[in-house]
Amino acid sequence: MEDGHGGVVLGSEISAGVENVFAENCKMSSPNLDRVLRIKTNTCRGGETKNVYMRNVTVGECKESVMRININYQPKEASERGHIPYVHNVWMENVTCQKSKYGVQINGIKEKDAVYDIHVKNCTFNNVSVKPFLRENRCHDIFFENFKVNGKLVNASGSDVVEKAPYKSYAEWMTYSEMKRNPNPIYLDFTDSIKHPKGKWSYVMGIELEGMLDTYYAHGGEAIKDYVMRYPQQMISDDGKTTGFKYEDFNLDNIRTAHFIFRADSLAPREGVRLALKEYFRQLINQPRTDEGVYWHKQIYHDQVWLDGIFMGLPYKTMAAPYMVKEGLTVANKGIPAGKKSKSGKLTKGQQKELTAYYDDIVDQITMTDARTYDEKTGLWKHAWDSKHGMFWADKKTGQSRHTWARAMGWFTMAQIEILDYLPEDYARRQEVIDMLNKTLRACIDYQDPATGVWYDVMDVKDPRNYIESTASCMFTYCLLKGARLGYLDDSYRQAGIKAYKGIINNFIRVDAQKDGSFPTISLTEGVSVSGLGPEKSPHRDGTFDYYMSEPIRDNDPKGVGPFLWATLEMERLGYNTSSQY
């Protein structure tokens, strides 16, 4: 093969179905040879292309890509649309190429995740001038095994090839990458600085910044410390007012960042921050509850318990309870203490009783959530539970939502392990939470993808549109590794966590070279931006699988970056760092 649009080409505008194609023992080379293996189709006719095998092919040079899969071919062509084409089970093995612009290109479509199960194994491409792997729109389950470009192994996240990592720690590398992308922390989470010039108060910022805080504690770096401290400095005034916080919303999401603020305040204590922390705790004292005593997720989500909300509220309550009891914030006074606080460093018997009551309430809430969201058929936990069984997304008999969203399960597992961080060793009900953690994470292992080591976005559905998702995968990995380190879990959980972390690096971490010559950044890819249920004014958020698949996927979602940092710090305790890859 010396010329043409491709050495092996499947399809075009009228491709329809193609399957069981074998190409092997071929030689190709020409500056006019556009591609080695090309699959092209679009939504005009749809169809399914599958079971394509290319092996033992030697290529001198090609003009564009060694492999290109394009299901968005001729997107402006005037024709009837809406027929989704699927491409899957494509193998390229033992293929060499000495010159090209790209290694692998995949052009998906925005509507569906229709390109998947693509394998490149034992392939070597040299003199790739632009990018080893370029992906556009949606695709998943892309597997690279012993795939070398310009002498370096390439993972399936589409990394640029770099000679050496600028940091030994992936946690430092990600932290400094995020600081470079977002110079001011009040604008994390893709916040529009024009619409929100004062920034946003959001649980999302707190999660990522707390991961950075722990990176600082592990590795130092005054720049990291200064960066994380800018958030409370800018968002909380000296009189304790928080920009964007509305007590009357009774929104558990707004409490999560208090967990970060409480810890960070020790670096530069400020009275205004302490006043704000009391206000957040006061919300928890007065938060509306279901008839069984579990917090509503938000005022607008009345009578509803979400796995998300357990993480947003209960770890902060557990951590802050001893301090708040000393400060006189009790259920009886609704968080507004009368008189002077005790100056004694020790709790009185009455205060100890109040503190134990707080702990009991925390364990009661998480165990009730466990019972109400657990699905015996799958061994998983549903995203949410409507205690009145009346919401449009809820099962009328059980009150449960339809599916298990992986990130909701991630919130639930992180809530458990963080509650254990602060429940005293001698607290009578501590073992209940440890047992729950074992049960929850064992279920996670049961649903861990054996090929990639990570997890799918909707855990209880097998469908070609489902995709491996990074934020939940980072959460589970963090909990598996930390739980094993602290002795809550046996070594099988640690091994699952190690497998998962390597899967994160191979499938989700992309290295981005910088045109200005500064240090290459890394990105966490394939994170779903959001998924929720309702409220009534948002009927499209109905908890169906189609709904979950409709939410956008993006890079560097802070809800994944924070847990990635925590998972990385756990792996570093086991001796793993960037030198394991470079």
Show where each model-derived region lies:
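Long, well-ordered core segments of solenoidal/helical folds
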Residues: S169-L188, D226-G244, L275-V294, G335-G339, ...
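Extracytoplasmic mature domains of secreted/periplasmic and thylakoid-lumen proteins
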Residues: Y247-M312
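Acidic/His metal-coordination segments adjacent to aromatic residues that form catalytic metal sites
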Residues: I236-T243, D291-Q299, K388-R402, W455-R465, ...
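Well-ordered alpha-helical scaffold segments within catalytic/enzyme domains
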Residues: G206-E222, R256-R270, G313-Q351, W411-R429, ...
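Oxyanion-binding "anion nests"
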Residues: F22, M28-L33, W411-D460
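Aromatic- and glycine-enriched pocket-lining scaffold segments that form the walls
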Residues: V294-W385, W393, M409
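Extracellular/periplasmic carbohydrate-active domains that bind, remodel
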Residues: M1-V162
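CBM-like carbohydrate-recognition segments
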Residues: P132-L134, E163, S169-G206, A218-K225, ...
